[in-house]
Structures are given as structure tokens and as C-alpha cells.
């Protein structure tokens, strides 16, 4: 069994597709089909086998999943998370990070005082957005780029942004 620290979330089953047990897979890899090159596991470390049927216009993958053969079985998989082992991922460049490593990192202001933490990194198609939960428990969505986040380390990020209070 693998601890979740050794696993990286690479996809999630969004819904079923058709009557033959196919599922729509939202891949977090770039390109989306890169997920097919990984040895996939579930949260318990059990192997997951998917086979690509097609790709829709949203970039989501339509796949067969393990031995699922009916729509009813596929409907039960909505929200099912697919992981790969961290050790199997390519080595990153100095300024690259996996989203899993950024979530929950402290957010510092320009004076390096902690002002919150990263709650999530999102992408709705127009670029990455960082969701920050500030110390007062409010959250804000900001563009995830060098202008707003000029420094990223493995221990914290620096935010270049003045909040309106």
C-alpha cells in the first residue's frame, strides 16, 4: 500500500458515457493523453487499467475502465480518483512544481510575512488560477503567474498583491 504522499493525482472520473460502461476521464496531465502512459493506481495502491476509446472536444478522455461493462457500473465511478506513483514521474526543472506539492503551502507577502495558504490551483481553460485562503478565512482567486506569484519554493510562495479590505 502506498501513502497518499507518494501518490500524485493525475485524473478523475467525471461521469459515464454511453451504455457500454465507458467513462469520461478528466486528465490533469498535459497533454491529456499522457495519463495513458502512466501506471495508474487508486488511493489504496491497487492497479487501475484504462483504455482510450476517444477524446471529446473538451479534451476529456472517453475510456474503458478495468472490467466495467455496463452503464450502471460506470455510474458508480463518478468522482473516482486516479493516481500515479510520485517516483514514476519525470524529474522537474528548477522552476517547475506539481500542483500536489503547492497545495497547502504558506503564502507570504512581499515582506515575507505569512498571510495565508494555497487552497487550490484551478484551470478553467484560460490559464491557471490560484485559490488562496487568507488568515482571516476569506479566499480569493488570482491569476497564477509571475506577476502575482513572483517566487515559488518547496516551502512557500510569495504573493505580489494588495488586498482590498
Swiss-Prot record:
One of its GO terms (biological process) is rRNA processing. It comes from the Bacteria. The keyword Chaperone applies. InterPro entries: PRC-brl_dom (IPR027275), PRC_barrel-like_sf (IPR011033), RimM (IPR011961), RimM_N (IPR002676), RimM_N_sf (IPR036976), Transl_B-barrel_sf (IPR009000). It is found in: Cytoplasm. Gene3D superfamilies: PRC-barrel domain, RimM. Keywords: Chaperone, Cytoplasm, Ribosome biogenesis, rRNA processing. GO terms for molecular function: ribosome binding. Residues 94-165 form the PRC barrel domain. Its main location: cytoplasm. GO terms for cellular component: cytoplasm; ribosome. Binds ribosomal protein uS19. Belongs to the RimM family. The PRC barrel domain binds ribosomal protein uS19. An accessory protein needed during the final step in the assembly of 30S ribosomal subunit, possibly for assembly of the head region. Essential for efficient processing of 16S rRNA. May be needed both before and after RbfA during the maturation of 16S rRNA. It has affinity for free ribosomal 30S subunits but not for 70S ribosomes. HAMAP family: Ribosome_mat_RimM (MF_00014). This is Ribosome maturation factor RimM. It comes from Rickettsia felis (strain ATCC VR-1525 / URRWXCal2). The lineage of its organism: Bacteria, Pseudomonadati, Pseudomonadota, Alphaproteobacteria, Rickettsiales. The gene is rimM.
Amino acid at each position: 500500500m502506498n501513502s497518499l504522499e507518494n501518490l500524485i493525482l493525475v485524473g478523475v472520473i467525471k461521469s459515464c458515457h454511453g451504455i457500454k460502461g465507458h467513462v469520461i476521464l478528466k486528465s490533469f496531465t498535459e497533454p491529456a493523453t499522457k495519463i495513458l502512459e502512466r501506471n495508474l493506481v487508486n488511493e489504496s495502491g491497487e492497479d487501475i487499467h484504462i483504455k482510450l476509446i476517444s477524446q471529446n472536444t473538451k479534451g476529456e478522455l472517453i475510456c474503458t475502465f478495468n472490467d466495467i461493462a455496463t452503464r450502471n457500473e460506470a455510474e458508480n465511478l463518478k468522482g473516482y480518483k486516479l493516481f500515479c506513483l510520485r517516483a514514476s514521474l519525470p524529474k522537474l526543472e528548477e522552476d517547475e512544481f506539481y500542483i500536489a506539492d503547492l497545495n497547502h503551502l504558506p503564502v507570504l507577502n512581499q515582506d515575507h510575512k505569512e498571510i495565508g495558504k494555497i487552497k487550490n490551483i484551478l484551470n478553467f481553460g484560460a490559464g491557471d488560477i490560484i485559490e488562496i485562503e487568507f488568515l482571516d478565512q476569506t479566499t480569493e482567486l488570482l491569476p497564477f503567474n509571475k506577476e502575482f506569484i513572483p517566487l515559488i519554493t518547496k516551502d512557500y510562495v510569495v504573493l505580489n498583491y494588495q488586498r482590498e479590505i
